[in-house]
Every structure is written in C-alpha cells, then in structure tokens.
Amino acid sequence: MATSSMSKGCFVFKPNSKKRKISLPIEDYFNKGKNEPEDSKLRFETYQLIWQQMKSENERLQEELNKNLFDNLIEFLQKSHSGFQKNSRDLGGQIKLREIPTAALVLGVNVTDHDLTFGSLTEALQNNVTPYVVSLQAKDCPDMKHFLQKLISQLMDCCVDIKSKEEESVHVTQRKTHYSMDSLSSWYMTVTQKTDPKMLSKKRTTSSQWQSPPVVVILKDMESFATKVLQDFIIISSQHLHEFPLILIFGIATSPIIIHRLLPHAVSSLLCIELFQSLSCKEHLTTVLDKLLLTTQFPFKINEKVLQVLTNIFLYHDFSVQNFIKGLQLSLLEHFYSQPLSVLCCNLPEAKRRINFLSNNQCENIRRLPSFRRYVEKQASEKQVALLTNERYLKEETQLLLENLHVYHMNYFLVLRCLHKFTSSLPKYPLGRQIRELYCTCLEKNIWDSEEYASVLQLLRMLAKDELMTILEKCFKVFKSYCENHLGSTAKRIEEFLAQFQSLDETKEEEDASGSQPKGLQKTDLYHLQKSLLEMKELRRSKKQTKFEVLRENVVNFIDCLVREYLLPPETQPLHEVVYFSAAHALREHLNAAPRIALHTALNNPYYYLKNEALKSEEGCIPNIAPDICIAYKLHLECSRLINLVDWSEAFATVVTAAEKMDANSATSEEMNEIIHARFIRAVSELELLGFIKPTKQKTDHVARLTWGGC
C-alpha cells in the first residue's frame, strides 16, 4: 500500500477481511439454554411463517375495514371536484366557489393508529382522484410561513410524470424562497397546462379530471393546529379558490365540535363540511381478535392473563390496535423463544410430521409438561408405563392429542360465537357486550360456575318468541358454515327448534291461558284480599306450561349442554402448552415498563445490565471501576435533601482514586485531578438531566435531591 503523493492527502485503506466481525444469523440468537441449534432454527422459521400469515391477514382486514370509509371519501371528493368544474364555467356559480369542500374525518383518540390510516388514504386518493395530496402536521406548521412552505414544497414534489418533473425543476429553484398563495396558483396553472390529459387518462378513470386535478390538503391533527394559522389559511384559500380547486380533510381525534371551537362563524362559513366517521377502535379490536385469535387458521393462542394484559394496555393507555398487534407479535416471539415444544405450534399435518422426528430430549420435554402429566395419571397403569418408557408410543399418542386439541378449538370457537349471540342481546350484558369479554371469562374458569352465567340462563328463559327465533337463526348460520365438523348436527337441531317455533299456534295458546285465569278481584277486606292472592300464587305454580314455554326451556337447556361440554378452559386440555403462551409477567415487563425502577437498577447495580464480572460488589459498596454516573448516584443516595457539591466532589474523587497511588505534589496528579473533576461535572449533569437533582437558590454551592426511597 503506497502512500507517496506530491501533495498532502488522506489515504483510506479497507481493513483486512479476517479482522472483520462476523455477524451471527438471527436464528442463533434464538437459541436458549440447552436446546439444539437445529431446533432453534426451525422454531425461528416457524415463528416467521406464522407472523407473516397473521400480518397479511391483519393488512387485508385493515383494507376491508377502511374500504367503505375511503369509498365515501373518494365519492365526496369527486363530487366536489365535478362541482368546481361546473361552477368555473358558470358566472353564477362563482359565489359557491368561495366555499372550500371539507371532509371532517373523525378517527377517534387512538392517535398512534392515525398515521397508518392517513397513509392508506393518501395512496387511495392518489390512485383514484388526484396526484396532488399533501399531509400536514401541527408540529411542522407553527405559523403561516411554515404552513405555506410545507404545503408548497410537498405539492411541488407531487409531479405527475418524470417529464413534468424535469420541466418544473427550473421553476422550483427560481422560487424556492418565495412561498405564497399567488406562487401556488401560478405553479398549479403551469403544471395543469403542461400535463397531457391523453397520457394520463390511462392512469385515472376519466381524463376530464386531469384537466384540473384538485389539490387535497390533509390536516392530520386538526386540534393541535394554532387557531390563527387555520383561520388565515382558510380565508386566504377561499380568495384563490377560483384559481385552483382545493379540498380540505380534517383529521379529528375528539369530536366534530372542535371545528366550531377553533373557527369563528365568519371562517367556518367558508367551508362546506361533510362528516365522516371511522370504525371505533373497540369494534376494530374485536374484529382483529375474531380474525387472528378466535380461529383455527392460526395455531398460536394466548391464555387469559396475557389477553388481559394486552386489553388493559389498549383500554387504559392508548386505544391503539397497532400496539395491540405489536404486543401479540411479542407474545408470539416469546412463546417460540422460551418454549422448546413450540416447534409443534404449526398446522396439524406439519405438526404430525415433525413429531416423528422429535429427539429424545424433546420427548422428555413432553413428559415434563404439567398437562401431559395429569393426562398420564388418568390412564391405566399399562398405558402409563408405555407413555413414560416407549418413545414410539409416546409420539403416536402425541399426534392423537394434538389432533384432539385442534378439534377442541374448532368446537370451542363455534360454541363461543353461539353463546355470544345469546348474551349480547340481553339487558345489562351479564357476560359482556363484546365477544372478547366473553372469551376472557371462558379462558379463566368454568363459565357455568359463575353467577353471571346463572343470570344469563334466567334471562334467556324470559325471552319472547321473536327474540329467541332471531338469535337461533344467527346461531344456525354460524353452525351451518362448519358442516364438515361433527357439530354440524347441531345446526340440524337448531333448525328443528326453528320449525317447531314457527308451527306454534299462538292464538290458541293465548285463549287457553286466558280461559284458565281466575276472575277479576272484587272489593273486599284485607283478609280476603290476602287469601285471594295466596290462591292465585298457588294456581300460578300449579299451572301447566304452554308449548312455547316448554320449547323455550328445551332451547335453553340445549345451549347450556353445549356450553358445559365444549367451553372447557384450555388448561384442561393435554399439550395446551404447545400452542398457548402464558408468560404474562414477561409480556408486562416489556410493554408496561417502569422507567424509574429500571433507572435505579441500572445506576445502583450496573452489573444487572452490563454483565461485567468486575462490576460485581457487595451490597452498599461502590466499585471504583463503575461508570461515573453510577458512582455519583450511589453517593447522592447517602445525602439528605440538600447536597454540598464540594463534599460530593471529594467523595467522588476518593472512590475513583481508591485503587490508585498518586503523589499529590506531582504534575501528573494535578492533571488527574482536573480529569476527575471534569468527570464529576459530567456525571452531575447527567443526573440532573435524568431528574434526580436540580439547582437550588437557597445555597449556590448545593443542589437539591428530588427522589427518595431508593427509586
């Protein structure tokens, strides 16, 4: 490698390839404990496959849920744009052009999901309405200058094709420092004149729209925009509306009333507002659960505690469906990482194939499962010996148990949906209004042992004929869609109930019931009145049930039998640990982290995170090789409300130089003291940044301590 040169220069040489750090594949990090590398790689690949399938299903579901909303928005924009073209040719319609078409899009308080929705909306508008779609956020537009700057700069990037982009580059550079509505109007006229509608008609449905495509401005978080900025922009835009078609979309998280609170009547009258409501986040979550968890399409499941952690974060923190899905992904990852037998958490044919190739260690892992041990204890003594000693017999039995678990899930979700059809129509919703609430209860315990279930049966025995028939028709559709399952006979039984209800002669029943009733009470004293009431009560008890009441009782008993037979908790099923993730504490540590406790642990015991053996120390001791901030933090824990900086600095220097022998009069010692002093200042500044201390006006050479209790 020659470095000779006629002039001074900097020479760069690539390092030796042998010295480069070789990065390990991801599946190697997936290995834990004594598990075999081949098995860890297979588990990682299975995790990736299942997550990719769940992710694709969620994306498809998201598009399906947004389709109706986006279609209505696109129809509104196209209608507003056609109105602009019509009025631009009509002199009498110039007054209407003062009103800006505005779509008020209410998305709910799940703000973290809005970016995904607006991204999909922007793509849909660019594909169906106009290429000129701009998304603005309040943090980027503190005043009118920045508002116009962001608006125009984004619009100039929205070029229709490469040719127009090249032609516009000259004009953009000439006016890049001048942002106003006049420049925007001039730019729009230039772009629309240069755009060839014949070339672009292939990309859109009608070429007439491309002669003057609208400019769509999306304000993602309208509540956060400054009132003056909004008012000025709307007033100025209304004056230029005859020059280019402008359409506004307000992203609203709270309520449409915010429009009238932010904008006075003189400004809001310049808007032609139409309201659009997205699906509520709770309904969205219910749909996601129904498609991802309440199905046999995906083998992975979570138990009641994990589901409770995820739903609590959703309900009490952010209402974010995307964060819920991320938590579900983390649960999937933790399950495949921590459970060696998760290699069998796949579709049933593949799981049966993998069972034949299980190693001896994996067979022992199966025998150690609590659910399998309970299953073995219930078997005969000969079968117990075979399960514990014969590997081949164990694999055959494992295949059978996994097949039974698959059938259990199919029946479980069918009966769960059927029960939800009944409970969701009852007053006060004893078992919850959403199916996720019913699912949580069924996962936790035997639902028929709860008081809420008893009240449900009591209310079902009071349903009218029309209500009961409506619910049975819904249940019939649920079971009819799974005829291949042995529960398909249940659909025939429900169909028989419906036929019996339709054949009832209500008129005759009412006449018979009215004929058996006693005559009306006459005026009498208290004694005879009480006697008559007692006779009526006894008569009501001994009264024969009508055909409808008998049939209704049969329906309730039939549903009760289904629930008791098929809605058993998952913990009762052998090998449920293979597909169910139950480590709720691990999930809570990741998703519900406590920053203050983590900070205290890191500063008080750096070995906990750094895993450096030299940092190990007895409780109460301060190792001198610990990070400076850790030393300063442990010293500040020994102080009271006010900390003397001089004393703190001396104690810090004493700890740092504890293992070093230096001459106090040497030049090296003075340089070392300066370095230690600088390190102390940096450590104190870091503690102040973290919020442990703050300056105080009581004493200039002191700082105030802000935390107590060791965390």
From Swiss-Prot:
Q: What is its main location?
A: nucleus
Any Pfam family matching the protein: ORC_WH_C
Q: Which GO terms describe its biological process?
A: DNA replication; DNA replication initiation; glial cell proliferation; neural precursor cell proliferation; regulation of DNA replication
Residue numbers carrying Phosphoserine = 23, 516
Reported modifications of this chain:
Multi-mono-ubiquitinated by OBI1; ubiquitination is important for efficient DNA replication origin site activation. Ubiquitination levels are low in mitotic and early G1-phAse cells and are induced in late G1-/early S-phase, peaking in S-phase and decrease toward the end of the cell cycle.
Q: Name one GO molecular function term.
A: DNA replication origin binding
Q: Which UniProt keywords apply?
A: Chromosome, DNA replication, DNA-binding, Nucleus, Phosphoprotein, Ubl conjugation
CC terms in the record's Gene Ontology section: chromatin; chromosome, telomeric region; DNA replication preinitiation complex; nuclear body; nuclear origin of replication recognition complex; nuclear pre-replicative complex; nucleoplasm; nucleus
> Which cysteines are disulphide-bonded?
none
Q: Which family does it belong to?
A: Belongs to the ORC3 family.
Q: How does it assemble?
A: Component of ORC, a complex composed of at least 6 subunits: ORC1, ORC2, ORC3, ORC4, ORC5 and ORC6. ORC is regulated in a cell-cycle dependent manner. It is sequentially assembled at the exit from anaphase of mitosis and disassembled as cells enter S phase.
What is the protein name given in its UniProt record?
A: Origin recognition complex subunit 3
Organism equals Homo sapiens (Human)
